[in-house]
Swiss-Prot record:
GO terms for molecular function: lipase activity. Gene3D superfamilies: alpha/beta hydrolase, Vaccinia Virus protein VP39. The gene is ynbC. It comes from Escherichia coli (strain K12). This is Uncharacterized protein YnbC. InterPro entries: AB_hydrolase_fold, Hydrolase_4, MAG_DAG_Lipase, MeTrfase_dom_put, SAM-dependent_MTases_sf.
């Protein structure tokens, strides 16, 4: 069958109202259910991917390819995105759109991505854990070769001093491919975007380092194609990434002599043979979900948690540094209100969290206020405040969704702390008929009740003491909630059995069509420091956390009877907020 296809040209609107251009090549066979989404290299656009559709020769498959924001025919300043995290969210929204447009589930989607596009996709898989069938990554740009010494720190310093600016790429087509026609077309294509915003280039490095270090969180079937003679990106980071992947189905292929444009090389038939074989294997079998059943005992995060619980080597440089930090906190912490509160109630307590939400540096003197400001501006607490913003956005979205379905909106938060984020989100929501806040701490309940009274919300908000891990208590909640919120709770407990009990109770309480909003912590850059220096609410013991990958957290929610439908994550990749709908069993 002739496979040459002319694409339809359309625009897709993102959640921040940016119009992204995309091409769609419908399947040539009626009733086809396979979908492949293509992501182009940096600087390029979807018009340069026509040969992939033609040469893969899959007439039973629909293809989609976008022009990334700021590229090709898409809107936005050339080469710019507000952040790499925003571009990763674009990936999530576009793939979900492609699946919906083709009327298939995500499990029927395979993604093929090159270079910078491959980094976006790898980050999306890590941060969002989408249930697609698999992915092919070609020469991901985890570490771009900057030939000027100290270019990266110089760019970071200049960005800090000057703000946003753009760097032009002077890479010529002859360094990208041996295919003279493709090289010439790259040099002369008016839609090629030579500029890249400095924030995106710096984000690309930082995010790539995070994804490589934590690649064990990626469990989807993955094929990695590495160009053997790449002038643009380093090889070793790609290998490090691949070796840490935990998918039971993964392949690495090194293509000798290939330049950076792996899928546009002169001898690209070699790469296409590898892709065709891998994709055929993916579609030949039913989509398989990774087994997270024993993740809290045998997974990499469990091993890391046990190592952190044991502490650093005595008198090692790390141990001495942590001892110094603990001494300094005891000596100076009394002057900082935030540090003093954390040392008194636990840095993971509801009281500490509420203080972080308020974000008002306080202390007994100017020095104490300065220390407090530094404390509140740590990346972890900035992530917590962004999590609060994401919670409020999804709570409002959930209320609107329930109201649109004709369901009464009855809210419960099973571990509300002081309840500030819930009260802020629901203060002006007339559709909400009942709000129940619960917490295990008597102090949190008392302070939460005081906050409710101060806001004049006592008529429709109740705050009671309760155990968020007691399935019988949760199953018996009255009236039955249609919106349940669990924020910042499961992250504090390494064992999954407690989480399963809590989710089982909520699944019994929430009627089909109801909504669960839950948070996650798939990664944290300060995990070791927190374990070595800060104390928890658990009798002053060290605050040692086990991070759960987004895939693990989503699997617990799915097994309890909920289907995840949307997610938010901060720009540092630390905290996620997800929304799931109760299935009708």
């Amino acid at each position: 069958m002739e496979n040459s296809r002319i694409p339809g040209e359309h625009f897709f609107t993102t959640s921040d109202n940016t119009a992204l251009f995309y091409r769609h090549w419908p399947a040539l066979q009626p009733g086809a259910k396979k979908v492949i989404v293509l992501f182009h290299r940096g600087h390029e656009h979807s018009g340069r991917l026509q040969h992939l559709v033609d040469e893969l020769a899959m007439p039973d498959t629909a293809f989609y390819a976008w022009d990334a924001r700021g590229h090709g025919k898409s809107s936005g300043p050339r080469g710019y995105s507000p952040s790499l995290a925003r571009s990763v969210r674009d990936v999530d929204e576009f793939v979900r759109f492609a699946a919906s447009d083709s009327q298939v589930g995500l499990e029927e989607v395979v993604v093929i991505a090159q270079s910078v596009g491959a980094v976006l996709v790898a980050t999306w898989i890590h941060d969002y854990a989408p249930a697609i069938r698999g992915l092919v990554l070609a020469s991901p740009a985890f570490k771009v070769k900057l030939y000027v010494p100290l270019a990266r720190p110089a760019l970071a310093l200049w960005h800090r001093l000057r703000g946003l600016f753009f760097i032009n790429s002077y890479v010529k087509g002859r360094y990208l491919t041996h295919d003279r026609q493709r090289g010439a077309s790259f040099n002369n294509d008016p839609l090629i975007t030579r500029a890249i915003a400095v924030n995106i280039l710096l984000d690309l490095y930082k995010t790539s380092e995070r994804i490589i270090r934590d690649a064990a969180a990626i469990t989807l079937p993955t094929q990695l194609l590495i160009s053997g003679d790449d002038y643009v990106v380093h090889r070793q980071p790609q290998i490090d990434f691949y070796q840490r992947l935990r998918s039971p189905l993964k392949e690495l292929h090194l293509l000798p002599g290939f330049y950076h444009d792996t899928l546009g090389e002169e001898n690209r038939a070699l790469a296409f043979e590898k892709m065709q074989s891998f994709i055929s294997r993916l579609y030949a079998n039913k989509s398989q979900k990774f087994d997270y059943q024993h993740e809290d005992c045998t997974g990499p995060s469990a091993d890391r948690w046990r190592l952190l619980s044991g502490g650093p080597v005595p008198l090692s440089p790390v141990d001495l540094a942590y001892r110094f930090m603990r001494k300094a906190m005891k000596l100076f912490g009394t002057h900082s209100s935030g540090l003093h509160l954390g040392m008194s109630t636990g840095f993971d307590s509801g009281s500490s969290l509420d203080y972080v939400y308020q974000n008002q540096p306080q202390g007994s003197n100017a020095f104490g206020r300065l220390v407090d400001k530094i404390y509140l501006n740590s990346v972890g607490w900035r992530g917590i405040r962004q999590r609060k913003t994401h919670l409020q956005i999804l709570i409002k979205q959930a209320v609107a969704d329930l109201h649109a379905k004709g369901l009464a909106v009855r809210v419960v938060d099973i571990a509300a702390g002081h309840g500030r984020y819930v009260l802020d989100a629901l203060a002006n929501e007339p559709a909400v008929s009942d709000i129940l806040l619960r917490d295990y701490s008597e102090l949190n309940v008392a302070q939460g009740q005081e906050m409710i009274a101060q806001r004049g919300m006592s008529g429709r908000v109740r705050f009671e003491q309760g155990d968020a891990f007691n399935p019988e208590e949760l199953s018996a909640l009255t009236p039955r909630p249609t919106l349940a919120i669990v924020s910042g709770l499961y992250e504090l407990f390494p064992e999954n059995e407690q989480v399963k009990n809590s989710l089982a109770g909520l699944a019994n309480a929430i009627e089909p069509g109801g909504i669960l909003i839950y948070t996650g912590q798939p990664w944290h850059p300060q995990l070791e420091m927190i374990a070595g220096v800060l104390t928890s609410h658990k009798d002053g013991k060290p605050w040692v956390m086990r991070v759960r990958s987004q895939g693990e957290m989503d699997s617990l929610v799915r097994d309890a009877g909920f289907d995840k439908c949307t997610q938010r994550i901060d720009e540092w990749g630390i905290f996620t907020v997800s929304m799931a709908v109760r299935r009708d069993n």
